[in-house]
C-alpha cells in the first residue's frame, strides 16, 4: 500500500494538481486530498489506491522500497 506522502510526492514530480490526478485516475479529488493529508495509511479504499498507483506508474512514476518508502520519476530510456 502506498502512503499519503508517496502519493503527494509522486503527483508533484509530475507537476500535476490534485484535480489532474483525480481526473486521470477517476478518483475523487476529495479522496486524493484526504489521502495526501496522511503521512501513513492514505485512508482510501484498496480500489482507489490501485487506480492511483496504476495512473502514476503509467505516467512514469516508480515507487521505491527499502528504508523509507519513496518515489522517483523513471528516465525515458528505462523500460
Where are these regions (language model features)?
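A detector for short, charged/polar N-terminal pre-domain segments
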Residues: 1-2
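Short basic helix-loop element that most often maps to the first helix and adjoining turn
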Residues: 7-20
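Short glycine/serine/threonine/alanine-rich loop segments
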Residues: 16, 27, 61
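Cell-envelope/extracellular anchoring and linker segments
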Residues: 20, 24, 34-35, 47, ...
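Recognition helix of helix-turn-helix/homeodomain-like DNA-binding domains
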Residues: 26-44
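DNA major-groove recognition helix of helix-turn-helix/homeodomain DNA-binding modules
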Residues: 46-64
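Helix-turn-helix/homeodomain-like alpha-helical modules used for DNA recognition
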Residues: 61-79
Amino acid at each position: 500500500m502506498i502512503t499519503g506522502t508517496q502519493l503527494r510526492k509522486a503527483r508533484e514530480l509530475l507537476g500535476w494538481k490534485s484535480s489532474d490526478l483525480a481526473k486521470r485516475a477517476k478518483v475523487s479529488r476529495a479522496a486524493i486530498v484526504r489521502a495526501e493529508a496522511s503521512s501513513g495509511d492514505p485512508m482510501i479504499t484498496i480500489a482507489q489506491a490501485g487506480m492511483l498507483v496504476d495512473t502514476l506508474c503509467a505516467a512514469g512514476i516508480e515507487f521505491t522500497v527499502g528504508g523509507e518508502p519513496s518515489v522517483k520519476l523513471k528516465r525515458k530510456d528505462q523500460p
